[in-house]
Amino acid sequence: MVSHEENTSIVEWFLGPHPYTYPPYGIEMIHEDDEVAVAHHHHHHQSGEYYREYEDHRSSDVDNDEIIARTLQDDFLQLEIAESNDYSHQNQQQQHQQEGYTNNYSNNNNGYAWNDQSPAVDYSSEWIGNDNDQDGRSDDSVNVFSCSSPSDTDEYVYSWESDQCDADGEFGRRLNQMVPIPYIPKINGEIPPEEEAVSDHERLRNRLEMFDFTEVKVPGDGNCQFRALADQLYKTADRHKHVRRQIVKQLKSRPDSYQGYVPMDFSDYLRKMSRSGEWGDHVTLQAAADAYRVKIVVLTSFKDTCYIEILPTSQESKGVIFLSFWAEVHYNAIYLNRDTSETELQRKRKWWRFGN
């Protein structure tokens, strides 16, 4: 088990004041119970939006220390490499068999090769945004790819709009099996004590393993939510300042949609959120979902909440991004392992540090 010093380092890693968080209207809460499966079904409509809360039921009894977590990540990497090699080997065998059959068929059928009519695969993407950035592309552009996009693409947003993308995955099956119950918005509690924070970290690690996610850790400098969003949207956490500006811009553009969930004067809230280092909350997450037209899935460490799903309120989502939320104080970007290339896994592995 982790020592007292390691536990302390985990908690002390995060800096900055505790944020107030008032979850807005486009949020789905998924709950987790340790013993009995509870199924309720009820929709609560408020301000034109739905609140849905799900119950999932799994025990959280895995050991959580640095060695096990890193070993788990190594296992993910080795599994990914092994599956990739096996898939490549199978493809080569199939290709050789197909080529042999095609040659024989062509010789006997006036040179006609039936496999030349293979269907074309469209890997096109859609860009969102119009302001020019220094790198020559749209400053607020987000590359949104479909489920069929190549896994080694540099920039993409996972798409949840098609059932076939997640139908074969454990994560998609778990989502489809959950049943909604009412959710009432509330302000987040206090920062948990050290012992509870360590327990939350253990619970989050278990859920990351259960849903087969890889975590990309970002600094705990007060900008973690915006860094995690930037990593998902632009594939670099360094664009967190731009993401913050876009979110504040969205908040300003629709004050009537957000100010009712802020426990202070809305103009003061906007000024606070405009400052670098100011913690993001569920209101800023909702604004991010609206501004970028994406669904945001937040895997949490809460005892009774497995994950939160935040939907754009006025437009159809163009894709989905994933974050983790630990002990009410820190966000990281997370990626489904099956959608991550070997190169991308190795890059994320360098980011994965504990107690820093």
UniProtKB/Swiss-Prot annotation:
GO molecular function annotation: cysteine-type deubiquitinase activity
Reaction it catalyzes: Thiol-dependent hydrolysis of ester, thioester, amide, peptide and isopeptide bonds formed by the C-terminal Gly of ubiquitin (a 76-residue protein attached to proteins as an intracellular targeting signal)
Domain OTU: 213-337
UniProt biased composition (Low complexity): 89-115
Pfam families documented for this protein: OTU
EC number(s) stated in the UniProt entry for this protein: 3.4.19.12
InterPro entries, per the entry: OTU_dom, Papain-like_cys_pep_sf, Peptidase_C85-like
Cysteines joined through disulfide linkages: none
Keywords assigned: Hydrolase, Ubl conjugation pathway
SUPFAM superfamilies: Cysteine proteinases (SSF54001)
Position of the signal peptide: none
UniProt pH dependence: Optimum pH is 7.
Disordered: annotated segments: 86-117
Record-annotated active site: D221, C224 (nucleophile), H330
PROSITE patterns reported for this sequence: OTU
Family label: Belongs to the peptidase C85 family.
Function: Hydrolase that can remove conjugated ubiquitin from proteins in vitro and may therefore play an important regulatory role at the level of protein turnover by preventing degradation. Cysteine protease with a preference for 'Lys-63' over 'Lys-48' over 'Met-1' -linked ubiquitin (UB) tetramers as substrates. Also cleaves RUB-GST fusion.
Name of the protein described by the UniProt record: OVARIAN TUMOR DOMAIN-containing deubiquitinating enzyme 10
Species for this entry: Arabidopsis thaliana
